[in-house]
Amino acid sequence: MAEAPMAQAPTAQAPTAEAAAEAPGLRNFTINFGPQHPAAHGVLRLVLELDGEVVERVDPHIGLLHRGTEKLIEHKTYLQAIPYFDRLDYVAPMNQEHAFCLAVEKLLGIAVPRRAQLIRVLYCEIGRILSHLLNVTTQAMDVGALTPPLWGFEEREKLMMFYERASGSRMHAAYFRVGGVHQDLPPQLVADIDSWCDSFIQVVDDLETLLTDNRIFKQRNVDIGVVTLEQAWEWGFSGVMVRGSGAAWDLRKSQPYECYAEMDFDIPIGKNGDCYDRYCLRVEEMRQSIRIMKQCIAKLRAPDGQGRVAIDDNKIFPPRRGEMKRSMESLIHHFKLYTEGFRVPEGEVYVAVEAPKGEFGVYLVSDGSNKPYKCKIRAPGFAHLQAMDFICRGHLLADVSAILGSLDIVFGEVDR
């Protein structure tokens, strides 16, 4: 019996150049995320290149909130420059003022009175809670939880009232001065902050009950946006972005400034470097901030915590109104200070503080005049945003907003 001939496989014909040109080729899809996207945290525009639902490339377009802050500061006296820093990270304004005041004080070689240091640290920790409350709750909102922002804003409202009672302004406080703070805190305000600290711990516990073990929240954040410690150092990360990857790096401990060396607090660190670890860190940092605030309040009430809230030199710090009504010399000092300002010795200095978003630095150059020659601002969010490309690569489109929420970006300081 003759075998049936084997079926020959059809030979593939190489397509001609004309046919290849006519065939629709596969290409990635490019979309705009923002600048009016609800999860964009301000005026962010991301150009995303997608392969289906998978992110291939992220291109952040910044500058939509650029106001030329660094250049404007060069044309203002050192006193007039302070309010510009409130408008950088406008979620926690006083932390930025702190860096600038420390830089000028270092050039002038002056020491701030102890009570002023305690007030500064107290309000910087209030700023940290303001920032973390907003971030943790909006990060939850970005992945679909709508209750946390309502709770968070209720507490932020109380903190903004503390800002207002100290400085007269809810957001742009301009409360810190070179040489101290503008006014002393009334005893009742200190008592109210103390009682708020006790009640706030319960709010943090309630937020954790809603989110920390929530199955949906964990699915959206665990193993998303993983950053190794090596990558964190390479990209110039700081703050929670470094601590989430396992490094106990906090300027309040490693390079203590003001009276942080006296404070007893812990530095929480993560081990996976993902969005969930960064969320857990911010929640724990709020608890540590409460610890620091309680210690500050106890020290403010102690006998050695009394006294002046600014230096005595009226050539640098404005004289009190009562003095001006009695002394012609004080009136002259006041007039000179607000018209001409004070002169800072020639030199350059870099001062960094542990702001809620990371290391906020001020590189200040003085030419001996009454205005800064150059004031370079090192914003932590700028370094974090530039890493969006490598963090988001390979993730789904829905993960982009979760990653963005965990980076904690505020555009005042990125665009400045």
Swiss-Prot record:
Q: Which reaction does it catalyse?
A: a quinone + NADH + 5 H(+)(in) = a quinol + NAD(+) + 4 H(+)(out)
Instruction: Check the record and name the InterPro entries matching this protein.
Output: NADH_Q_OxRdtase_suD (IPR001135), NADH_UbQ_OxRdtase_49kDa_CS (IPR014029), NDH1_su_D/H (IPR022885), NiFe-Hase_large (IPR029014)
Q: How does it sit in the membrane?
A: Peripheral membrane protein
Q: Which UniProt keywords apply?
A: Cell inner membrane, Cell membrane, Membrane, NAD, Quinone, Translocase, Transport, Ubiquinone
What Enzyme Commission number(s) apply to this enzyme? Answer: 7.1.1.-
The compartments listed are: Cell inner membrane
Q: Which family does it belong to?
A: Belongs to the complex I 49 kDa subunit family.
Role of this protein: NDH-1 shuttles electrons from NADH, via FMN and iron-sulfur (Fe-S) centers, to quinones in the respiratory chain. The immediate electron acceptor for the enzyme in this species is believed to be ubiquinone. Couples the redox reaction to proton translocation (for every two electrons transferred, four hydrogen ions are translocated across the cytoplasmic membrane), and thus conserves the redox energy in a proton gradient.
HAMAP family per UniProt: NDH1_NuoD (MF_01358)
The subunit structure is: NDH-1 is composed of 14 different subunits. Subunits NuoB, C, D, E, F, and G constitute the peripheral sector of the complex.
This protein's name: NADH-quinone oxidoreductase subunit D
